[in-house]
Amino acid sequence: MEQELTFRIILEKPPAGVDFGLQQGRGSNYEVVQKQRSKTGDLHFEFTARVKNGKDGPTLLGPFVQGPPNERFVYLGIGTFAGQTDTPWSRRLKIPLRGITWDVIKQASAQVLETRVRGTGKDGSPTCGTIKPFAGWKVKPL
């Protein structure tokens, strides 16, 4: 049985003047959607993924989902990876899709799974790479 889940990423206070976007597709065959230029506040990205019964629990599928079944994630493109030409930044932010159990899926059926990610690194540049530590996904109202 497949079910569709809605996800929301809140990128908290990224550096101003940088483009961010959600990567749809894989490898070199992708496009950036929901492109946003940071100003002073948070950026919000939403996407859906299908979930089906996998060998070791839920398996997420869809055009935004990347990686092997047990290590799924989504990418946010930063700077040139989001299509911005007037920037020194050329990065991606890897947001894990882990910790999503059948119990969480049941709770989230008519709601959204939300995570909050720090948008600025310790050096003042856009956060990039794999999110560590990752706070996980929380069930929130739509």
Indicate where each model-derived feature is located:
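Extracellular ectodomain segments of secreted/surface proteins
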Residues: M1-Q3
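A short, amphipathic beta-strand motif
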Residues: L5-L11
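Beta-strand acidic-aromatic groove motif in beta-rich domains, primarily in extracellular
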Residues: D19-L22, T59-L61
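Tryptophan-paired
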Residues: G27-F81
